[in-house]
Curated annotation (Swiss-Prot):
Organism this protein belongs to: Drosophila melanogaster
Biased composition (Polar residues): 329-338
Disordered as annotated region, ranges: 1-23, 265-296, 325-360, 376-456
Protein name, entry field: GATA-binding factor A
Gene from which this protein is expressed: pnr
Transmembrane parts of this sequence: none
Length: 540
């Protein structure tokens, strides 16, 4: 921006021409009007000039403040050699040192006369481009005169503490503080002493008392001494059985040993022990020793829940497999007992049935803690089977197979044959409740078996053995592909045939009892399984 140049006759004229400019038009021309404000410079004329704002095409002179008189007489900006760019069309803009207007409110008249608003630029540019040190330092001294600065600043009292004479706290003698305060008499206090005096009504103590001194003075009482050792300093005063005061050491010694503490053990100083940081694992170790049974149960339930939440299929496989082994063993023993005592009375069989149902319910309730939804489904199936067993007049020999299906939670069937009838007994499986294999192979319980029931005695044994096949294959229905033996498992039809179960175990008794009946029906069941598998493949 161009600046109006003065002739340099009087200092007041140079300062008065820098007050406030009046801008007109589209910011292309700036009319600078200034009047003489001093009586000593009344002869000076008012200068009005029009110059270009950013780049002056006529004159490229950017002289500032008290330029030399020869510059004014010789022409604008001609006699000032090396001051600024001398080219007419200078591509580089050289800013002036005009400051913001609001500086005058804080830094007095000297700064206000040397301050000018730069329209079109949001920052104030200092004149650091000039090699003329005299002109630059002269303007700097006039702009930041210490007398005018301290005289006109509204923060004079605050600045006086920082740059003026030093202050000292009358209480602690501090010479530097974030905030100086005054007491009631007008003396200066540091921030800490002032706040302490304001809160407590007394001067802040200068010396912190020793911790040992505080404990000694706090526990020392006038005319109080230990009746055993005679000491007057202790961490805790106690009383003996007679009510006399004793020190902490003598009191504890008498409490532990039942005799007075010997005088030879007296020490002048108070013996203190070094405290070790408390370990968090010590309490848990003691608790584990006392309540190991409860802790192990809780840990088992917690692990069961975590596995069920993270990997429900994996946890289902682990727990259901072990559950099937125990249920199959109990079911096998009960079936052998019932078959051995087939000639027993009806009432005894019903009592045994009720007892076994109670045992199954207890096992299911324990297993339901980990799998509540699965336990509910199994409980509903047990109730349905209980209704079937109450309505049927015979077929008590099917109890073991029924309980095996209830424990596995896979299949329900209706024994509709009576002891003297020749009606057909259809074994139906609920496909909605029968899970599929984890690899996508359909469950073996989708294959329905129909055999004609009559008065033949081997149907009881065959039914028990046949449903034991299903209980063994039910392991695969849980998502675990269990291959008992390569000779007994049909991979094409997904079923077991034969009389042995290999690794599943617990079926030796049933195998020995079933024997020939299972082998007789193996061919028929195999053919029927092929037909059912073909139907399932076609529908799926």
């Amino acid at each position: 921006m161009g600046i109006l140049l003065s002739d340099g006759d009087s200092t007041s004229d140079q300062q008065s021409t820098r007050d406030y400019p009046h801008f007109s038009g589209d910011y292309q021309n700036v009319t600078l009007s200034a009047a003489s404000a001093s009586t000593s410079a009344s002869a000076s004329a008012t200068h009005v000039a029009a110059v270009k704002m950013y780049h002056s095409s006529a004159v490229a002179a950017y002289t500032d403040l008290a330029a030399a008189g020869s510059a004014a007489s010789a022409g604008v900006g001609v006699g000032v050699s090396g001051y600024h760019q001398q080219a007419v069309n200078a591509p580089v803009y050289v800013p002036s040192n005009r400051q913001y207007n609001h500086v005058a409110a804080h830094f007095g008249s000297a700064a206000a006369q040397n301050a000018w608003t730069t329209e079109g630029f949001g920052s104030a540019h200092a004149q650091f481009y000039s090699p003329n040190a005299a002109v630059m330092m002269g303007s700097w001294r006039s702009a930041y005169d210490p007398s005018g600065f301290q005289r006109s600043s509204p923060y004079e009292s605050a600045m006086d503490f920082q740059f003026g004479e030093g202050r000292e706290c009358v209480n602690c003698g501090a010479i530097s503080t974030p905030l100086w305060r005054r007491d009631g008499t007008g003396h200066y206090l540091c921030n800490a002493c002032g706040l302490y005096h304001k809160m407590n009504g007394m001067n802040r103590p200068l010396i912190k008392p020793s911790k040992r001194l505080v404990s000694a003075t706090a526990t020392r009482r006038m005319g109080l001494c230990c009746t055993n050792c005679g000491t007057r300093t202790t961490t805790l005063w106690r009383r003996n059985n007679d009510g006399e005061p004793v020190c902490n050491a003598c009191g504890l010694y008498y409490k532990l040993h039942g005799v007075n503490r010997p005088l030879a053990m007296r020490k002048d100083g108070i013996q203190t022990r070094k405290r070790k940081p408390k370990k968090t694992g010590s309490g848990s170790a003691v608790g584990a020793g006392t309540g190991s049974g409860t802790g192990s149960t809780l840990e088992a339930i917690k692990e069961c829940k975590e596995e069920h939440d993270l990997k429900p299929s994996l946890s289902l496989e682990r727990h259901s497999l072990s559950k099937l082994h125990t249920d199959m063993k109990s079911g096998t023993s009960s079936s052998s007992t019932l078959m051995g005592h087939h000639s027993a009375q009806q009432q005894q069989q019903q009592q045994q049935q009720q007892q076994q149902q109670q045992q199954q319910q207890q096992q299911q309730s324990a297993h339901q803690q980990c799998f509540p939804l699965y336990g509910q489904t199994t409980t509903q199936q047990q109730h349905q089977q209980h209704g079937h067993s109450m309505t049927s007049s015979s077929g008590q020999a099917h109890l073991s197979a029924r309980h095996l299906h209830g424990a596995a939670g896979t299949q329900l069937y209706t024994p509709g044959s009576s002891s003297g009838g020749g009606s057909a007994s259809a074994y139906t499986s609920h496909s909605a409740e029968t899970p599929a294999l984890s690899n996508g192979t359909p469950s073996p319980h989708y294959q329905h078996h129909h055999h004609l029931g009559g008065t033949h005695g081997h149907h009881v044994t065959a039914a028990a053995a046949h449903h034991h096949f299903h209980a063994a294959a039910a392991v695969a229905a849980y998502g675990v592909k269990t291959e008992a033996s390569a000779t007994n498992y049909d991979y094409v039809n997904n079923c077991y045939f034969g009389g042995t179960f290999g690794a599943l175990g617990g079926a030796a008794t049933t195998t020995a009892m079933a024997g020939g009946a299972a082998s007789e029906l193996a061919g028929y069941h195999h053919q029927h399984n092929v037909i059912q598998a073909a139907k399932l493949m076609a529908t799926s």
